[in-house]
């Protein structure tokens, strides 16, 4: 079926993403049981002005976060009933920062996901946050939504490196965030939310201007001190990570220097009992991210919601509009919200 046929099929049967799934999806009636899926809720917010110039990212000071999350909720509710024969293995809020944008609406959204989808026992619910941008209302949303993994976009513990990144709040803001999140769990890492233990992951960057093996190890050790049960190592990309790339070019590490930095971080992680379960993802035993594992395996279908979100079932991909106005007003109308449908592979 060509992309036009898929889109017409979606509109003819109530206009839900579930109709795209129904084109080829094996169902319980065919004896396959519940089909495993992951759900991605796209939260494309960055606190830097203009989304730091990253295409598709939104500045929460310029865009009404509540209006966006409400549109996201409408899209979710419009599709949920079509996935009764599927089991959600993981829910991830992707694309940017989810915390401190519209916390009350976020908690309600995650509650709606739990109530309207069939979640597997122990299904992961993961979101991203920034140091200093987790309020008491954020923690309430985490509790309501049964968040089980908080990924801190920490980047570095070095003030010098932080300045090159142009972040809004310096790394010391993590001290406040750690207090807001509450005491460490009994095992010495992660947090406790309404009596449930949640993992605390830290994203660190490799190749920041001015970064050295010593400063990199200090960033890893800072993550340990804050209670990290997982650490993710990502590459610093000037277009996406640096506020003033031109002025930082002179002290940007060479490829060889960046590998030395990475090796120092990996050595520190291994010495602390962390193991690499996926390239760049290190975790203590038993604290690996189910979402990352499922996505890496490539065997689980993906249901995406939000601005520019991607849904993939049986080699048929649908992409939502990247136009904010269209999404805010027509998120529950696939004829207008879905921008493209095509086969992949």
Where are the model-predicted features located?
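C-terminal scaffold of the Radical SAM
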Residues: 34-36, 62-82, 86-345
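Detector for the c-type heme attachment site
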Residues: 54-59
């Amino acid at each position: 079926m060509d992309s036009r046929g898929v889109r017409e099929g979606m509109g003819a049967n109530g206009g839900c993403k579930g109709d795209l799934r129904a084109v080829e999806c094996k169902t319980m009636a065919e004896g396959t049981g519940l089909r495993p899926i992951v759900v991605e809720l796209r939260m494309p917010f960055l606190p830097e002005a203009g989304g730091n110039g990253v295409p598709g990212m939104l500045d929460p000071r310029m865009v009404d976060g509540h209006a966006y999350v409400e549109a996201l909720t409408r899209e979710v509710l419009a599709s949920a009933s079509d996935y009764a024969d599927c089991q959600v293995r993981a829910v991830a809020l992707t694309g940017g920062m989810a915390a401190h944008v519209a916390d009350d609406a976020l908690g309600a959204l995650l509650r709606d996901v739990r109530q309207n989808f069939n979640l597997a026992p122990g299904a992961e619910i993961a979101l991203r946050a920034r140091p200093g941008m987790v309020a008491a209302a954020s923690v309430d949303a985490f509790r309501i939504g049964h968040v089980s993994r908080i990924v801190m976009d920490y980047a570095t513990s070095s003030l010098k490196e932080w300045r090159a990144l142009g972040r809004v709040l310096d790394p010391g803001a993590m001290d406040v965030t750690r207090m807001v999140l509450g005491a460490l769990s009994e095992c010495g890492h992660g947090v406790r939310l309404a009596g449930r233990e949640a993992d605390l992951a830290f994203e660190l960057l490799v190749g920041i201007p001015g970064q050295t093996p010593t400063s990199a190890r200090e960033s890893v050790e800072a993550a340990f001190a804050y209670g990290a049960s997982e650490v993710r190592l990502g590459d610093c990309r000037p277009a996406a990570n640096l506020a003033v790339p031109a002025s930082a070019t002179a002290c940007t590490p060479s490829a060889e220097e960046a590998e030395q930095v990475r090796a120092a971080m990996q050595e520190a992680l291994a010495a602390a009992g962390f193991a690499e379960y996926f390239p760049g993802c290190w975790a203590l035993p038993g604290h690996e991210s189910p979402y990352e594992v499922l996505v890496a395996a490539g065997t689980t279908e993906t249901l995406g919601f939000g601005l520019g979100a991607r849904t993939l079932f049986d080699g048929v991909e649908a992409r939502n509009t990247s136009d904010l106005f269209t999404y805010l007003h027509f998120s529950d109308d696939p004829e207008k919200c879905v921008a493209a449908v095509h086969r992949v592979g």
